[in-house]
Amino acid sequence: MTAGEIFSGDRSIERNLRQVTNPYLPSWEYVPDGEPYVFGDRVYVYGSHDEFGGCVYCPGDYVCWSAPVTDLGTWRYEGVIYRKSQDPLNADMQGNLYAPDVAVGKDGRYYLFYVLSDRGTVSVAVCSTPAGEYEFLGHVHYPDGTLLGEKDGDEPQFDPGVLAEGDSVYLYTGFCPRGDKSRHGAMCTVLESDMLTVKRAPVFVAPGCEYSEGTGYEGHAFFEAPSIRRFMGKYCFIYSSERCHELCWALSDSPTGGFKYMGVAVSGCDLGLENGKRADMPLFYCANNHGSIVEIEGRWYVFYHRHTNGTNYSRQGCLEKLEITADGCIKQAEITSCGSAKPLRGEGEYPAYIACNIFGKDEQVYVPWQGWMDDRFARITQQPREKGESFIANIRSGTTVGFKYFDIKGLRRISVRTMGYARGRFTVSTSIGGRSAGEIPIGYFNVWADGESEVDIPDGVHALYFTFEGEGALQFSSFRLIC
């Protein structure tokens, strides 16, 4: 795409994809680790850049997308904002651009903080606009010139999150894998207003799992992905926990310490929720997670990412509306196809790749580290060409594909578009393991073909689940709601 081009969906289902759907960017775009910000009348998302079929994290240059604050269904491609070749420490191009963050400096300019995949130091780029072409500025360093992360006693820097307030800039970093006692937790380093010079050395603000006993973080200790926001008059620390699939949150009156663990904001597989299932039943296949929260037009949202193609390395951004309790607490968001803001229209065609739930007879939470899911599991994938069509592949008997939620009014029939060497039926229901609302025959096809059936679904807001029973392996492209 060229900068400024607006994505509003594939032509055949363009109208329905102008609603808020997950993933919120085009099906062929892979921008995980999303840090959302409202600048002016638009929401900008900054993240790393995966690719379809990738074998490593973050091989692409940074791109930016934005949307009007009043329409989170219409995203505009802002173009490439920074290239990994611009960092002097990356002259050999061996380092990938890991998860970034952006802060507005005292001078009104926009500062992009990032870490290269093969370094333990923080780099900074700067731009006069939110989504222009950022220019390399420098590396975060101590007053004597030593780079943060290279001084004796420093822990390696990773996943920078940034908050600028007045004359101080708060930089949060850290990576704490299980079994590594050399990594203690998430760190906060205070910088000068030049965005580069260390004002106060790092202090630990949230423990890693090796040091969480007795802290209140047990079972949800810091792993990676630190992010910081102002929330309800306090400092809200968002991070990925030792469980990887969840984003947790902690609160403090100070940006440099005293953070109390509060709970889970979102799990990429809905673990912990009893939304028509056991709390320990995963509804999607997960690995790491990274994102943050943002207030848009008086509503709070959480941005996170999902995993596709049966690997760790093709991640896509998703969002959900948050429910804030009367006492100012974040309730764990349910993962949906509609971003939870309002249900999708109960008519017309929808792509299967907006599925929020995919699970089978064999329950599994995690996508294998440094590997691929085996042929027991379905996965969201795409045709192997630039901007290829996305679909769900390898649906086998017992697999359920779920979509949430639709405003159903007068629905009479549902058709599905499938392909593959499979025979059987899709049983349609509105809840996991619920009564059958209809059965759609599935045939053995070398090309995309449609199957259709009457359904009995009352008016109202409903989820839709398609459970395949039969033989062979099925590909699922789209479905149509016919009123």
Predicted regions and their residues:
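Carbohydrate-active catalytic/glycan-binding domains of CAZyme proteins
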Residues: M1-E439, G443-C483
